[in-house]
Regions:
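Extended, folded cores of ATP/NTP-driven motor/assembly subunits in large transport
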Residues: 2-428, 432
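Active-site-adjacent "gating/activation" loops or surface patches in catalytic cores
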Residues: 422-461
Length: 461
């Protein structure tokens, strides 16, 4: 009897083991099915957005965003211009290798009714009503021949690596304070964005065809059970095409700028931002560690010298003057030595820069026309605007001010490449427009960042 009982127990245990294996197998299959179900919210590349404006973008990456305005540079005295130029150099030199920063220039079309509401002047039924009506008529005429409802805004987003929010918050607040102080020295109005304001930028970027105001407060998340992504997400994302994408009823495309010219002026970026279409220009900038940058340039100088020696050996073997070597070697060699001198003795930094352009439109034809116009400006300055192939999703998420670059294509620049000596367009005279959907205060014309390139290191990875 005991033996039979033992056999039955063994058999029962075997059945239980089989059941457990099948159960685990089914659980794994269900988990795979759940992972395959993609959503719009999963495409939006951040984890959490706090009330104070601190965003956990991915893993250990945290970011904050500052909106900045403009100052009057053209009418300043020469001494003031020199001071602004030097302070702007110090501003860019502030960012070390531990801080990634992103400059965003956003142009979007707002409703003309919204502008008309701002300039509307109601009669007060007094002796000055005639003056008010005449002034209101003048404003409407200026609006009719103005910027067609184009609103321009600009932001700087900076991100750091930290183990948790407790470690990230004091670091981000210190960097924010330093940046605001640098802007104050420059005389540039600036203020940090809170969580709602940052979410509004995402909402307006992902929903350019929706003219309704952004409605959100953190208290509603508790009542509804939704998260912040649910409030900013469009109705759909479609990334099946090679070099375009769709978000809701809008079609868009992300391109990157390949700089081929030996030198650029700030006029190029100014022309990009003068386009009367929806356009977002982003410059992702990462400072290179000083020792690493010097080592890199030294290796380039060594490579150029080795190439010179090889050319001289060829000249001797061929029986002509060894001083006759390709002119490019002399040019690149001189540029490399000057760059090394700047890094070692002039307290300059080297930067990795990615320039991205996001065009959006309602139809494919309108998008092609906008991209053609943008590419024409790039071609005018001997640059190439290239569409991202099969990287439109990464390009879109790199084109919103979150402080993370998902596109690995970049170019090397030193401090002189980030600023042009002709900075009269860096801070142009103030041009007051109407209020934006972000804030009720007056908005100002876009500040233009000048870029001057060196031919020494011009590669796309």
């Amino acid at each position: 009897m005991r033996k039979k009982k033992n056999k039955k127990t063994v058999a029962d245990t075997g059945y239980k083991k089989v059941d457990r294996k099948e159960k685990k197998k089914k659980e794994k299959q269900e988990e795979k099915r759940r992972q395959k179900k993609l959503s719009v919210q999963q495409s939006i590349a951040y984890k959490e957005m706090g009330k104070d404006g601190i965003c956990r973008v991915q893993g250990k990456t945290y970011s904050k965003c500052i909106r900045f305005y403009d100052i009057n540079y053209q009418l300043a005295q020469n001494e003031d211009k020199n001071a602004i130029f030097e302070n702007w150099c110090d501003f860019l030199n502030y960012f070390d290798a531990s801080i990634h920063f992103q400059l965003s220039f956003i142009n979007y079309k707002s409703s003309m009714k919204e502008f008309e509401q701002v300039i509307r002047i109601r009669p007060q039924e007094d002796a000055f009503d005639d003056v008010r009506m005449e002034y209101a008529k003048m404003l409407k005429q200026q609006l009719a021949k103005g910027n067609n409802g184009l609103v321009k805004s600009k932001y700087i987003t900076f991100s750091i690596e930290a183990d948790n929010i407790r470690e990230a918050k004091p670091k981000l607040e210190r960097i924010e304070s330093d940046i605001l102080n640098n802007f104050k020295i420059l005389g540039v109005p600036a203020y940090p964005l809170n969580g709602v304001e940052r979410l509004q930028i995402l909402y307006e970027t992902f929903n350019p065809d929706i003219m309704t105001d952004f409605q959100f407060d953190y208290g509603s998340m508790i009542r509804t059970g939704l998260n912040t992504k649910d409030y900013v997400a469009p109705t759909s994302f479609v990334f099946k095409d090679r070099n375009t994408f769709r978000m809701g009823n809008t079609i868009g495309a992300v391109s990157y700028l390949q700089i081929l010219a030996p030198e650029l002026t700030d006029k190029m970026l100014a022309e990009f931002l003068d386009i009367d279409k929806n356009l977002i220009v982003n410059l992702h900038v990462q400072s290179v560690d000083q020792m690493k940058a010097i080592k890199l340039v030294k290796s380039k100088v060594t490579d150029i010298n080795r190439m010179k020696i090889e050319e001289q050996k060829k000249a001797v073997r061929s029986g002509y003057d060894m001083d006759i070597i390709p002119s490019d070697l002399n040019t690149y060699g001189g540029e490399a030595k000057r760059l090394l001198e700047d890094l070692q003795s002039r307290n300059e930094r080297m930067f990795l820069v990615t320039a991205l352009f996001l065009n959006t439109a309602k139809t494919k034809q309108a998008l092609d026309n906008a991209i053609f116009q943008t590419a024409g400006i790039a071609q005018k300055y001997n640059c190439v605007l290239k569409r991202l192939d099969y990287q439109q999703e990464e390009g879109l998420m790199s084109s919103v001010p979150l402080g993370v670059n998902h596109i690995p294509m970049h170019q090397y620049y030193n401090m002189a490449t980030m600023i042009n000596a002709d900075v009269h367009r860096l801070f142009p005279s103030i041009d007051i427009t109407m209020k934006t959907r972000l804030n009720s205060r007056a908005d100002f014309e876009v500040t233009v960042l000048a870029i001057k390139t060196y031919p020494m290191e011009r590669r796309v990875q």
